[in-house]
Amino acid sequence: MDQEAKDLLVRGAAQLGVELTSAQVGKFALFAAELRKWNRKINLTAITTEREIALKHFVDSLSLCRAVGKGGKLLDLGSGGGFPVIPFAILHPKSEVVSVDAVEKKIIFQRHMGRLLGLSCFQSIHARGEELAGRFAGHFDWIVSRAFSDIPTFVRMALPLLRPNGAIVAMKGQGGREEAETSRPALEVLGVEIRQVLEFPLPFSGDGRSLIVMGRKNES
């Protein structure tokens, strides 16, 4: 990334309450370079400029920290090119972080990035979310997704993998609150409640973002 993109990353993260070290910025720069290089051969993302990657991938991913605390075990369902899971792993390198996607080429890229960035606690799995229950039943404190599916479908897939008192977080755009409200009847059937809806603008772009935080009823 050029200096302008790095500055946007650092300042955007700071607006979200995240302070990045120079070493972390260096890892994000390497991630951006590899993402652009691999994207020429395989379709990982439609976001390709350094500025867009800094804001719409990296800063957007770091906004997850408004809902997810440090520590605990995190799963990203349908992680695509590695968002938000790899930025989260860069920020919290000692946390157990697991990424799952059904598209093998995206997982190959994620594993490459995990090795290159030295993310020893990061694991990337080629599978569908519903295939994880036998291996990871009740395992995760946090289960997240970014533009993966509708909320009820995501929650159905996440519930068997969630620890008691764990949280499910859907990262959505400006219409997140409306989607959450229309999802309430389906969530009620699943025994899940909406604990919090966090709405905020993405730094510098002003695009609306929402974090829908959910959990099992009677556990909050």
UniProtKB/Swiss-Prot annotation:
Catalysed reaction, written as an equation: guanosine(527) in 16S rRNA + S-adenosyl-L-methionine = N(7)-methylguanosine(527) in 16S rRNA + S-adenosyl-L-homocysteine
Record key words, sorted: Cytoplasm, Methyltransferase, rRNA processing, S-adenosyl-L-methionine, Transferase
Annotated disulfide bonds: none
A Pfam family: GidB
Enzyme class of the recorded protein, top EC level: transferase
Keyword Methyltransferase: yes
Keyword Lipid biosynthesis: no
Chain residues that bind S-adenosyl-L-methionine: G78, F83, G129, E130, R146
Subcellular location: Cytoplasm
GO terms of molecular function: rRNA (guanine-N7-)-methyltransferase activity
Entry's EC annotation: 2.1.1.170
CC annotations in GO: cytosol
InterPro entries (alphabetical): rRNA_ssu_MeTfrase_G, SAM-dependent_MTases_sf
Family to which this protein belongs: Belongs to the methyltransferase superfamily. RNA methyltransferase RsmG family.
HAMAP family xref list: 16SrRNA_methyltr_G
Alphabetical list of NCBIfam families matching this protein: rsmG_gidB
Function: Specifically methylates the N7 position of guanine in position 527 of 16S rRNA.
Protein name: Ribosomal RNA small subunit methyltransferase G
Protein's organism: Geobacter metallireducens (strain ATCC 53774 / DSM 7210 / GS-15)
